[in-house]
Structures are given as C-alpha cells and as structure tokens.
Curated annotation (Swiss-Prot):
Binds 2 heme b groups non-covalently. It is found in: Mitochondrion inner membrane. The gene is MT-CYB. The keyword Endoplasmic reticulum does not apply. This is Cytochrome b.
Length: 381
C-alpha cells in the first residue's frame, strides 16, 4: 500500500513542502529565518486573537481595555507582552531574512523576491495600525504624523488623509478601522506567505555558494526540521526573556499615558523597527520629498535584482561587495539610532549623510563593486 503521506491530496502538499522537499546540503543557519518568520506569524495571530476578545476599539475605552487585559484577564499580561515583543522578534527575523537574501543573491529568484517585498510592506502596515490600537500618547501622535504624510500628495492629498481618518483628524472612526485592518491584514500575510513558498519551491532554495545545488540535495526532513527546531528554541528563549523580564524595554514610555490630542509629546517616534525609514523621512526638509524618500527606502528592494552586475551570485567570494554590504548594515543601525533622536544638530547632519549613503550604496557602489570584481577575476594574460 502506498504511503498516505504521498497519495492524500492535502498530505501530498505538506509532504512536498516540508518532508520530502529536496534541499541543498550546505544551507547555513541564515536559512532558518523563513521558518522562524512562519512561527512568529502564528504566535502573533494566536496572541492577537485572544487580545481581540477583550479589546474595545473605541477612543473612550481602548486604553482602559488594554489595562484591563493586563490586570484582570487570566494571563492577559503574558499574552499582551508576547504580542508586543513578538512583533519585535518578527521584524528582527524579517530584517535578517532580507539581509541574507541580499548577501547570498537570493533576489535573483525574482518572483519569490518581489512577493517577499510585498510581504514586508504588508507586515509593516499591519504593525503600524497595530501600534495605534492601545490609544496611548505615542499611538495617537504616531498615527497623526504618519497618516498626515498623505496630505503631501499633490491635489488629492488632503482628501486622501481625511478619507483614511474618517473625519478631519485621527479619532474614533480611525481607531475602529485600524482595528479592522489589524485583524484582516495578518490573514493576507498568511496568503502571501503561501504564494512566497509556492514560488520558492518552483526553483528550490539558493545556498551560500550561489552555485546550482541540484547535484547535491538532501530531504528536508529530518535534516532541516531538526535544524529549524534549534532555531525555534532560541527564538522562544529570546522572546520569553524579553516578555517576562523586560517587556517594556522596546516600547515608548509615552504610551503609558492615554491619548491626548491637546498635548503633543516632545519627541514623536515610531517603534524601533521603523526608525531607519523614519530617519530617512526626516532627513529631507521638504514634506513631499521626505514621503518619496520614505517610500523609496523600502521599494528600492524591488530593483535590487536589476542592479546585480557580478558574475557570481553570492557575496561569499566577493570581498569588496562584502565590505559594502556590512557598511550598509552599519548604516542601517546608524539610521535606526538617528530616528530615535531629537531633530537637532549633530543628529540632523548625521541622518542626512546616512540617508545619502544608504541610497548611494545600493544604487551605485554595490553595482560598481560587482563590475570591479568581474574585472579582477578576468585572466590578465
């Protein structure tokens, strides 16, 4: 009798995706983040589902309902802390996953890469609307500042902003619709993640060498299931350490005060995972210019496959590109730091230089490095 795993229509899909999937024999721990992201998404959906049972999306009661969850609901404090810090873990894994894709040339699987960028944008949108829900000071003012950027769009901007708000400012209608968005978007993320996997399994995984691995494949189970399990243990360990010992360290103290439209916080800033883009937005004095730079900072990922000039796929054997890659990583850390600082010197000039360097590295220096490495590898005799 044939194995049910290989014949049953549903089991067959699972089998081809997670059990008998041929995987390169040399993929490193940098390939763990896909499965970690899947688990992060499941954690966020489950904890979010239980939070939604007790949350009320009304400006008068939203803040109190979150306090009620933490004080009166059984393990509500744990569910909320896991959800808030789970978002940070999600973005940490996302950034490392994208970084891995850039370093090892995984972006040359164009469909997988483009769906991945759409996924990144959708997760960012989900996190943004979610941050507004507790209706603290930073929630309210963050929502006001970011949605107000829409008004920079010529001609239709103001109408668009008021349409998103459901009124003339961020208010009850905005909170209600943001809760609706925050509930629906994760399921769209799940659908996109399935499409992402579908395209990935059309080509098979890339590997650190960047060389076609077809001649040396091994089954996903048990080799990579056990490897992913180790990654999951570390993920849970870090998440639990964060959620149990220091749950508020990544949040903003202003969010412990209920939203007050009459009192602006001294420094309005988003969560840490948006600070790099926020720094780029603030580095341009013009409002529309800032919005375009903000969009470009993420959408630039879509043109990375077009900027690949090297004869080798991976950066593993390309020291010049490696150096530029790590400068880019350090630059992103710098932008994250600047995004959290007040708008004054020397932070303004550092932010502007870091923003320039970000675009310069991706658009000019890295493609040039690829051409230079091609030249250096050519026989000179």
């Amino acid at each position: 009798m044939t194995n049910l795993r290989k014949t049953h229509p549903l089991m067959k899909i699972i089998n081809h995706s997670f059990i008998d999937l041929p995987a390169p024999s040399n993929i490193s721990a940098w390939w763990n983040f896909g499965s970690l992201l899947g688990v992060c998404l499941i954690i966020q959906i489950l904890t979010g589902f239980f939070l939604a049972m007790h949350y009320t999306s009304d400006t008068l009661t939203a803040f109190s309902s979150v306090a009620h969850i933490c004080r009166d609901v059984n393990y509500g404090w744990l569910i909320r802390n896991l959800h808030a810090n789970g978002a940070s873990m999600f973005f940490m894994c996302l950034f490392l996953h994208v970084g891995r894709g850039i370093y090892y040339g995984s972006y040359l699987y164009k469909e997988t890469w483009n769906i991945g960028v759409i996924l990144l944008l959708t997760v960012m949108a989900t996190a943004f609307v979610g941050y507004v829900l507790p209706w603290g000071q930073m929630s309210f003012w963050g929502a006001t500042v970011i949605t107000n950027l829409l008004s920079a769009i010529p001609y239709i901007g103001t109408t668009l902003a008021e349409w998103i708000w459901g009124g003339f400012a961020v208010d009850k209608a905005t909170l209600t619709r943001f809760f609706a968005f925050h509930f629906i978007l994760p399921f769209i993320v799940v659908a996109l993640a399935i499409v992402h996997l579908l395209f990935l399994h059309e080509t098979g995984s890339n590997n650190p060498s960047g060389i076609n691995p077809d001649s040396d494949k091994i089954p996903f189970h048990p080799y990579y299931t056990i490897k992913d399990a180790l990654g999951l243990v570390l993920l849970f360990l870090i998440l639990l350490l964060l959620a149990l010992f220091s749950p508020d360290s990544l949040g903003d103290p202003d969010n412990f005060s209920p939203a007050n439209p009459l009192n602006t916080p001294p420094h309005i800033k988003p969560e840490w995972y948006f600070l790099f883009a926020y720094a780029i937005l603030r580095s341009i004095p013009n409002k529309l210019g800032g919005v375009l730079a903000l969009l470009a900072s993420i959408l630039i990922l879509l043109i990375i496959p077009l900027l690949h000039t090297a004869n080798q796929r991976s950066m593993k054997f390309r020291p010049v590109s490696q150096t530029l890659f790590w400068i880019l990583a350090a630059n992103l850390v710098t932008l994250t730091w600047i995004g959290g600082q007040p708008v004054e010197q020397p932070f303004i000039i550092i932010g502007q230089l870091a923003s320039m360097l970000y675009f310069l590295l991706i658009l000019v220096l890295m493609p040039l490095a690829g051409l230079f490495e091609n030249y250096m590898l050519k026989p000179k005799w």
